[in-house]
From Swiss-Prot:
Co-factor(s): [4Fe-4S] cluster
Note on how the cofactor is bound: Binds 2 [4Fe-4S] clusters per subunit. One cluster is coordinated with 3 cysteines and an exchangeable S-adenosyl-L-methionine.
Residues that hold [4Fe-4S] cluster 1 according to the record: C39, C44, C50, S276
HAMAP family: Lipoyl_synth (MF_00206)
Location(s) in or outside the cell: Cytoplasm
Gene from which this protein is expressed: lipA
Family that this chain belongs to: Belongs to the radical SAM superfamily. Lipoyl synthase family.
Protein name: Lipoyl synthase
Length: 288
C-alpha cells in the first residue's frame, strides 16, 4: 500500500480550522459528556465549519471499530462493552446544543450478537423522547446484510437513514473491510422500501472513472436512494489507501449535475463534502 509517488494536494483542499465561541462550546459539550464524534476521529475537514455552527455528528457504540477499512482513520481492534447510558448522554447533548437536526453514526460492532442494532434503536428513541422537535439522520453500518437488524433501526423512525457505498463497484473490495457492494445496495433498498428517505455517500479520487461513478449512481437510483454525497478521498496516513487523483471542483460540479439528471432529489458534490455535510438541508426532502 505504500506509495512514494504521492499526489500533491491542490490549493482548494487547504483549509484552516477556526475556533469561534460556538466551536468552543460544542467541543465542551462533547467532551463533558464523554461523547465520540466522527468529526474528530475521522479528521473531517469541515469540523471547524460545523462545530462553529453548533452541529456535530455523534458516533455511538464506542470509538473502536471491528473492521479495518483502508480509507478510514477510526481506531480498529477489540471494542469495549456498550455504554448503556450513551443513548441518554447523546440525547442530552443534543438538547444542550439546541439542535433542530441531529446526525448519528457508529463504528461497526461485529463482536455483538445483534451487531449493535438494539443500541442504535434505543439511541434514536431517546433522542426523540428528550428532543421531540429534533429531526434525526442516522448513518448506519451494513449489519452484515441482516434485514431484521436493519429493521430495528427503521422501526425507531429516524427521518433519514444513510448507508455509504463509499466507492465504485470495482474498487469496493480493495478498500472496504468485510463489506460488500451488493449487500450495501440491498440495505439501501430496504430503507427506501420502508418509506424512510434513503441516502448514501461516496469518495472519489481512489482510481475510479467517471463512467464507474455514473454506474454507481444508476445502481443507487435503482434501489430508491434519494440523496447522494460525493467528496474527495483524503489519505489519513501513509498506511492507508493512497490517493490516486485529486478531482477538480469542475468535475464535482459535473457529478452533481449528472446525479440530479439521473433522479436524485439532492446531490452534495464538492471536494470537502462528507456524509453529513449540510445534512440539515436534506431533511426537507422527507417532508414533501
Amino acid at each position: 500500500m505504500g506509495n512514494d509517488k504521492r499526489v500533491r494536494k491542490p490549493e482548494w483542499l487547504k483549509i484552516s480550522i477556526g475556533a469561534n465561541e460556538r466551536y468552543t462550546e460544542t467541543k465542551r459539550i462533547v467532551e463533558s459528556h464523554c461523547l465520540h464524534t466522527i468529526c474528530s476521529s475521522g479528521r473531517c475537514p469541515n469540523m471547524g465549519e460545523c462545530w462553529g455552527k453548533g452541529t456535530a455528528t455523534f458516533m455511538i457504540a464506542g470509538d473502536i471499530c471491528t473492521r479495518s477499512c483502508k480509507f478510514c482513520n477510526t481506531q480498529t481492534g477489540r471494542p469495549l462493552p456498550l455504554d448503556p447510558d450513551e443513548p441518554t448522554h447523546v440525547a442530552e447533548s443534543i438538547a444542550l446544543m439546541k439542535l433542530s437536526h441531529a446526525v448519528i453514526t457508529s463504528v461497526d460492532r461485529d463482536d455483538l450478537p445483534d451487531l449493535g442494532a438494539a443500541h442504535w434503536a434505543q439511541t434514536i428513541r431517546e433522542i426523540k423522547r428528550l428532543n421531540p422537535e429534533t429531526t434525526t439522520e442516522v448513518l448506519i453500518p451494513d449489519f452484515q446484510g441482516r434485514k431484521e437488524l436493519v429493521d430495528q433501526v427503521i422501526k425507531a423512525c429516524p427521518e433519514i437513514i444513510s448507508h455509504n457505498m463509499e466507492t465504485v463497484k470495482r474498487i469496493s473490495p480493495q478498500v472496504r473491510s468485510a463489506a460488500n457492494y451488493h449487500t450495501s445496495l440491498e440495505v439501501i433498498r430496504q430503507i427506501a422500501e420502508s418509506g424512510i428517505t434513503a441516502k448514501s455517500g461516496i469518495m472519489v479520487g481512489l482510481g475510479e472513472t467517471p463512467a464507474e461513478v455514473e454506474e454507481l449512481m444508476d445502481d443507487l437510483i435503482s434501489v430508491g436512494c434519494k440523496i447522494l454525497t460525493i467528496g474527495q478521498y483524503l489519505q489519513p496516513t501513509h498506511k492507508h489507501f493512497p490517493v490516486a487523483a485529486y478531482i477538480t471542483p469542475e468535475q464535482f460540479a459535473v457529478y452533481k449535475e449528472t446525479g440530479l439528471k439521473k433522479g436524485f432529489e439532492q446531490v452534495e458534490s464538492a471536494p470537502l463534502v462528507r456524509s453529513s455535510y449540510h445534512a440539515e438541508k436534506h431533511i426537507r426532502f422527507n417532508n414533501k
